[in-house]
């Protein structure tokens, strides 16, 4: 079942250590098949060096039950599941503890849009969620992690299709895209703009956000209705 999707998810997971986005077994990638109502996700705690496509776990979006697979799915599976339910435009999700994005998350800081590298992928400030409550942490923690992400986007009026990433306060980044590969691509860029942002803040603590006109130009030329960037 879903052998092609399993291979795609495996390859996307293997890309995480190659791009220095994970340490040890941290991090996970999933991808969804909406017609079948399932998603494929990395198994929990399996080393990237020995992981195979057969290790990938198929999970129901509706129930959260394992549909296929012999291993336990990632502990972050409920977060992925809720995001697939809440954001129907996304096809793949990545969670990492990449160093510089996690620094922003641990500081409880959103990443402002100060340059065109950021604007090419993220249409504005990359948000950081609020702190989770004790009840949320002690309850269905991973599910509530998804809820706090969705709450942040709803309260701030952010379109998940235009903002393919978020920082969870005191935790780390989640990124998404049209498929697993695209989600990893966005996670790589998220880490890079987080890295740049730290130095920008050191050099110019009062640096304002970039011009809205320039933000619009760079985002919309790649992603807008009249996009013209690329082949």
Curated annotation (Swiss-Prot):
GO CC annotation terms, alphabetical: cytosol; protein-containing complex
GO biological process: L-arabinose catabolic process to xylulose 5-phosphate; L-lyxose metabolic process; pentose catabolic process
Pathway: Carbohydrate degradation; L-arabinose degradation via L-ribulose; D-xylulose 5-phosphate from L-arabinose (bacterial route): step 3/3
GO terms, molecular function: aldehyde-lyase activity; identical protein binding; L-ribulose-phosphate 4-epimerase activity; zinc ion binding
Keywords of this entry: Arabinose catabolism, Carbohydrate metabolism, Cobalt, Isomerase, Manganese, Metal-binding, Zinc
Taxonomy, superkingdom: Bacteria
Subunit structure: Homotetramer.
InterPro entries, sorted: Aldolase_class_II_sugar_metab, Aldolase_II/adducin_N, Aldolase_II/adducin_N_sf, AraD, AraD_entero
Source organism per UniProt: Escherichia coli (strain K12)
SMART domains xref list: Aldolase_II (SM01007)
Alphabetical list of PANTHER family matching this protein: FUCULOSE PHOSPHATE ALDOLASE, L-RIBULOSE-5-PHOSPHATE 4-EPIMERASE ARAD
Protein name, as recorded: L-ribulose-5-phosphate 4-epimerase AraD
KW Transmembrane (keyword) present: no
Effect of residue 116 to E/Y: Loss of the epimerase activity due to an increased steric bulk introduced by the mutation which causes a conformational change that is incompatible with catalysis
Phenotypic consequence of residue 229 to F: Loss of the epimerase activity
Regulation: Inhibited by glycolohydroxamate at concentration above 0.1 mM.
Residues bound to substrate: 27-28, 44-45, 74-75
Binding residue positions for Zn(2+): 76, 95, 97, 171
Reactions accelerated catalytically: L-ribulose 5-phosphate = D-xylulose 5-phosphate
Phenotypic consequence of gene deletion: Cells lacking this gene accumulate large amount of L-ribulose 5-phosphate when incubated with L-arabinose.
Function statement: Involved in the degradation of L-arabinose. Catalyzes the interconversion of L-ribulose 5-phosphate (LRu5P) and D-xylulose 5-phosphate (D-Xu5P) via a retroaldol/aldol mechanism (carbon-carbon bond cleavage analogous to a class II aldolase reaction).
EC number: 5.1.3.4
Signals that turn on the gene: Induced by arabinose. Transcription is dependent on the transcription factor AraC, the cAMP receptor protein (CRP) and cAMP. Also induced by L-lyxose.
Record note on what altering residue 28 to A does: Strong decrease of the affinity for L-ribulose 5-phosphate (LRu5P)
HAMAP family given in the database record: AraD_entero (MF_00989)
SUPFAM superfamilies, A to Z: AraD/HMP-PK domain-like
Free-text remark on how the cofactor is bound: Binds 1 zinc ion per subunit. Also able to use cobalt and manganese ions, but less efficiently.
């Amino acid at each position: 079942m879903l052998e092609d999707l399993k291979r795609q998810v495996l390859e996307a997971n293997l890309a995480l250590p190659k791009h220095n986005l994970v340490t040890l077994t941290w991090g996970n990638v999933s991808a969804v098949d909406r017609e079948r109502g399932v998603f494929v996700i990395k198994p929990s705690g399996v080393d990237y060096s020995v992981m195979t496509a057969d290790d990938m776990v198929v999970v129901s979006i509706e129930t959260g039950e394992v549909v296929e697979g012999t291993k336990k799915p990632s502990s972050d599976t409920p977060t992925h599941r809720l995001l697939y339910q809440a954001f129907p435009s996304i096809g793949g999700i990545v969670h990492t503890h990449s160093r510089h994005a996690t620094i922003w998350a641990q500081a409880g800081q959103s990443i402002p849009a100060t340059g065109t590298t950021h604007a090419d992928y993220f249409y504005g400030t990359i948000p950081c969620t609020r702190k989770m409550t004790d009840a949320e942490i002690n309850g269905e923690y991973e599910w509530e992690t998804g809820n706090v992400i969705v709450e942040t986007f709803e309260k701030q009026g952010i379109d998940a299709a235009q903002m393919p990433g978020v920082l969870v306060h005191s935790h780390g980044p989640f990124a998404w895209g049209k498929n697993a590969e695209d989600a990893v691509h966005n996670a790589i860029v998220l880490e890079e703009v987080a890295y740049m942002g730290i130095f920008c803040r050191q050099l110019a603590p009062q640096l304002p956000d970039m011009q809205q006109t320039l933000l619009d130009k760079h985002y919309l030329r790649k992603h807008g209705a009249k996009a013209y960037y690329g082949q």
